[in-house]
Structure formats: structure tokens, C-alpha cells
């Protein structure tokens, strides 16, 4: 699903840029981790333990890095990016530095008021990705923010009234929310939102509690089959590629042996301007000293950023991106 800001004639332009970046082995997607600070308390992530003093080291602009890489897709993430009061300035600087781009923001949504959403939209955000792993109180518990789910759903009408027309839920597939995946998709469809799935991994802090063990793989296969069937009948809601959804059970069964291409099509730039190939890897160099990455023999995760980078660019993938959910 795309914002109404984008028209069908943008497709060949984006495909041309995608081809150019791929041939040149330049990143198609750059994640700007604008802060490692976070006010959530997720059990599977330790970013919330980042000292408040880290704020002093955060870059005041990512525009030069954006101009250097000239990616097709840009994501502002963290930590919790909306903690930065100057986030609009950061977004506007990057938006002005790159031609032909698609800019997204990943947030837990707890501080995304309609007014703030409109301000970020005007600065250049094209899509808001709000984390949502459960439809009940488990979401509040998992994120450590009381009332978070109600706050997110309560703000959606106001955000849409501000003219923001592109909201997705980012849902992590975990052992204890397999029963929630299809209901989340249906709720998103009712709200005119999209859903993007990513498989849980313990590589952030070693928490294995949410890993899907081998005896749960048949259930995982059943759920992903249901998601694929829904996707075939309702284009524009689930925004993952068929390839990614089909490959998730294979990864869970330990059947994925291909090297990871993180760092080739996607990179992460931390709050100080240093580059890492993966969000769970240490940094390698400052962006001004960037060196091209090679595939790495790592099977620690099957995040969407890895799986989607391996998905073939077919016509069906273009339809996935262009289609919009029907209210």
C-alpha cells in the first residue's frame, strides 16, 4: 500500500532506481537509527536500558549520509524515534537530500498524536509503521506501557483526519501470538491499514521465550498458509512478499542455508553515524568510510529486512506495494 502522494507513473521511476542501486551494489534501504533511547520496556530488546546521556552523542542531521547513499527507501527508527523533539528537522533534512525516495517511520505509537503525525507527514514521512503484536492487554504488557493498545487505536481516526493516509502495523511473529496474526490482519483491514510481519529472534538480548520451537512449526505453517490465502483474496493489507511468508516455516525448521545479504541491499546507521550491516550486529565504520559488504554466513534471524531483500522483484511484488486496503 502506498500513500495517495504516489501515482502509478512513479512505479517505473522507482524500478529504474532499484535496478541502478542493485547493479551498483548500493543499499536500496537505509535505516537511520536516530536514537537508541526508548521509553518502552520490551522483554526482547534492551534499547530501553540506554542511558539518557547518550542523547548528547546523537547526530543533529543525517542529510549528508542520506545524500551519499541516495537510497530508494529510508526508515527512521530507534529506539523510539519520536523521543527526539527534533525528529521533524531530521526527516525534512533527509527528504530534501534525496530525490525519488520513500520514507517510513517505525514507532510503538505511544506518543504519536494526530498533531505529531501531521507534523512528521509534512516533514516528509510517507508511511507510519506502528508496532502491534497482540489485540488484547498482552500488547501493553509486552511493551511495558499501560494502555498502549487503546492509545494507538484511539489515535487512528484523528491521525487519518489530519490527512495521513498510510499506516501499517508491524507485527512480530512469536510463539505466543500465533493466534493473533490473522485477527490483527482483519482488524487492520477494517481500519484501512496494512500489516507487515517479521519473525522473532533472540539475537537482540538472548531472550528465547518467544522463539517458535520445532514442535510449533506445524502450527506456524498453518498460520502462514492462512495469511497467504487472505493475501491472495485481499491485496493491499498484508504487505510482505509471498516469498517471505512462504519461507518463514522453512527457516523455523532449520532448512535455510543461504548466506545473509544484509549490508548489501540494506544497512543501518546508528545515532552517531556509524554503519552496521544488521540491527543486531556491532558497527563497522563511520558512513564517511563506507565499504561495501559481502554476504555473511549467518542464520541468526529471519527478519523481514533479510527475507524481503532476498525476495525476487516480480510483478506480484509491485502489486503488493501499490495496492491499498479497502475500508
Segments (PLM) and residue ranges:
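Radical SAM enzyme [4Fe-4S]-AdoMet core and its adjacent flexible, acidic
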Residues: 54, 118-262, 271
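Generic beta-structure capping elements
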Residues: 33, 131-133, 200, 278-281
Amino acid at each position: 500500500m502506498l500513500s495517495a502522494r504516489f501515482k502509478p507513473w512513479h512505479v517505473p521511476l522507482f524500478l529504474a532506481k532499484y535496478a541502478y542501486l542493485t547493479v551498483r551494489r548500493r543499499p536500496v534501504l537505509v535505516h537511520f537509527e536516530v536514537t537508541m533511547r526508548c521509553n518502552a520496556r520490551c522483554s526482547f530488546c534492551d534499547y530501553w536500558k540506554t542511558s539518557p546521556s547518550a542523547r548528547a552523542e546523537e547526530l543533529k542531521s543525517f542529510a549528508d549520509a542520506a545524500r551519499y547513499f541516495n537510497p530508494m527507501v529510508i526508515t527512521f527508527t530507534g529506539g523510539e524515534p519520536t523521543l527526539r523533539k527534533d525528529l521533524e528537522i531530521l526527516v525534512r533534512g533527509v527528504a530534501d537530500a534525496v530525490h525519488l525516495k520513500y520514507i517510513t517511520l517505525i514507532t510503538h505509537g505511544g506518543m504519536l498524536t494526530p498533531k505529531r503525525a501531521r507534523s512528521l507527514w509534512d516533514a516528509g514521512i510517507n508511511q507510519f509503521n506502528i508496532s502491534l503484536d497482540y489485540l488484547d492487554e498482552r500488547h501493553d504488557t509486552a511493551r511495558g506501557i499501560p494502555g498502549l493498545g487503546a492509545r494507538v487505536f484511539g489515535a487512528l481516526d484523528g491521525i487519518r483526519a489530519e490527512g495521513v493516509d498510510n499506516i501499517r502495523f508491524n507485527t512480530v511473529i512469536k510463539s505466543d501470538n500465533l493466534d493473533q496474526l490473522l485477527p490483527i490482519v482483519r482488524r487492520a483491514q477494517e481500519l484501512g491499514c496494512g500489516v507487515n510481519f517479521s519473525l522473532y529472534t533472540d539475537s537482540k538480548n538472548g531472550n528465547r521465550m518467544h522463539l517458535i520451537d520445532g514442535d510449533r512449526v506445524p502450527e506456524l505453517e498453518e498460520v502462514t498458509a492462512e495469511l497467504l490465502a487472505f493475501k491472495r483474496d485481499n491485496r493491499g493489507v498484508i504487505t510482505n512478499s509471498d516469498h517471505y511468508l512462504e519461507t518463514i516455516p522453512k527457516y523455523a525448521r532449520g532448512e535455510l542455508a543461504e548466506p545473509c545479504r544484509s549490508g548489501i541491499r540494506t544497512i543501518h546507521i546508528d545515532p552517531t553515524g556509524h554503519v552496521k550491516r544488521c540491527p543486531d550486529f556491532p558497527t563497522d565504520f563511520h558512513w564517511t568510510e563506507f565499504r561495501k559488504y559481502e554476504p555473511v554466513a549467518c542464520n541468526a534471524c529471519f527478519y523481514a529486512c533479510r527475507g524481503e531483500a532476498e525476495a525476487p522483484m516480480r510483478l506480484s511484488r509491485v502489486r503488493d506495494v501499490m495496492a491499498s486496503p479497502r475500508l
